[in-house]
Amino acid sequence: MFAIIGPTASGKSDLAIKLALKLNYEILSLDSLSIYKEIDIASAKPSKEELSKVKHYGVNEIYPNEKFDVMKFIEIYKKIPHKNIIIVGGTGFYLKAMLEGISQMPEITDEIKKKAKQKDYAFFESVDPDFASKISPNDTYRIQKGLEIYFATKTPPSVYFKNNPPKPVLPDIPIFEIAVDRSVLRERIKKRTDKMFNSGLIDEVAYLEKKYRDRRLPALKAIGIKEVLDYFNGKYTLKTLKEKIITNTARLAKRQQTFNKTQFKKKISAPLEELEEIILSEIK
């Protein structure tokens, strides 16, 4: 088992499929958009033909109106009957969480969620000043999660996490990174965006909006989808729409490269054209 990381549009999926066919491995995708059914073009997920050649886990698992977090990927991983797999995806956060582990969370009922929403940062600070000092007063997501733990366990989150330390899900596996120059990556992003439009991106987003009728869904806020929805509202021309998707994707890729650089110290980095040979020599 090993992982391939790299920014969006760097060629991870194609490389993983080539290696999986050579090694007789299967693939676990840690992609926050490919996990959804019905989002085929905006996610740039492998084609039906590619999915038929190599078994993929983490692709087409849930519908766009279903929620998921890292626990979903952990659940998928634990159900894989063997470990001859290549873990691949631009969302390095999920890989890091699985390598370092996450604490077992208490059961959070709708009543607890409602109770937590009624409280603010000042209340959170009064019940757990240590934990509150580490987050911004504007970080409503983490405040909400912290309060949910407090109300579910009657324990401050800092104490709860101390008593429930994270347990790694993945072993210490080899990590290979696709090293790619930003200018080259931007050109790859441009080509991929053109391909998306030629494949019917606008029709796909129109279908998603018509079926789910809720632009607040996390899936419909993804790059490539949210811009098309704005285009429907008359915010962009078609040309501006393409440019906006390219720019936003390039910004995402930059953040992913920074994350991978700072969070995965023990990795082998090489250009795409060299990495296949390096991986084969390391794995075999």
From Swiss-Prot:
One of its GO terms (biological process) is tRNA modification. It holds the Pfam family IPPT. Substrate binds at residues 8-13. Residues 31-34 are annotated as: Interaction with substrate tRNA. Its EC number is 2.5.1.75. The record marks 91 as: Interaction with substrate tRNA. InterPro entries: Dimethylallyltransferase, IPT, P-loop_NTPase. Keywords: ATP-binding, Magnesium, Nucleotide-binding, Transferase, tRNA processing. NCBIfam families: miaA. This is tRNA dimethylallyltransferase. It comes from Nautilia profundicola (strain ATCC BAA-1463 / DSM 18972 / AmH). The lineage of its organism: Bacteria, Pseudomonadati, Campylobacterota, Epsilonproteobacteria, Nautiliales.
